[in-house]
Amino acid sequence: AYGKSKGATINVNTMDFTRLDLDWLLEIIGRLVEAGADIVRIDDICAPCIPAVYEHHAKAVKAKIGDVPLAIHSHDDFDLATAAQLSALQGGAEILEGCINGLGERAGVPNIAVLAAICEIFYGYDTGIRLDGFQELSEFVAQVWNQPIPEHLPGNGRTAFSHAAEVHYVLPSDDQWSFNAWAPSVLGNTDKVALCHYSGPMAIKRRASDMSLGELDTATANLVLEQVRKELKLRNGPLTDQLFTELVEVAARASASGETDTERLEAWNRLLQSD
């Protein structure tokens, strides 16, 4: 009543809603709305249930509060926070919540960039958010919080749109959908070539092209691939752009000059010793 008297928008938060008796939860929420609540927010506290519960409870709460907006707050303890948000949305929730890079207590909360993208791509909503600005914002928050963006963070991670297996590169260059559900540019991210033991010459060619190292012929690409596989075993980790560039340069010289296997091996060894 005090907040309403001051003209404030009253957002009430019902915490741990999934472990409350549903009838009792609805009784509490009904009284809060009668007292003037402008927004009802249901908060799972620690995600102790499956997504279907969020939809079920959201439907029940929405039937109780009518036109009063329903918000949902979920946590990622079981890696289900985003699914919980979408289930609540399908149950009638109008306000979804997340955070940049999924930052939050314990395992975090939904990554708001992906949550917003899902709402637009799959549900057709206009969120009013400039989605392609999320990557810049993600990197800014990571810097300010001194918490690097997780490599595999959907949408914003460095490898979120990376492809390694050779089968991903044997398709026509303009085929971007056979192995992608959405374009990295939606969130301002980019796709990357991640080399691994499943990579082949087409992946080598694509990475060289992306790095402006020229268009490699198949023979040169195979020379690079041979050494890339050796390096991956030795280093037990990804190759840096610098090392890849040096491998391409050595292979290109070998192909152009017709170096023997022994000469090429000596060149590789000199490169590794200088690395």
Regions found by a protein language model. Give the residues of each.
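Alpha/beta enzyme core
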Residues: A1-L70, L86-A93
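Generic anion/oxyanion-binding catalytic loop in active/binding sites
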Residues: T14, G104, K230-K233
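A generic secondary-structure micro-motif detector
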Residues: T18, S74-H75, A194
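Catalytic alpha/beta core domains of metabolic enzymes, predominantly
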Residues: C46-N180
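A mid-to-C-terminal "edge-of-domain" accessory segment
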Residues: G124-D275
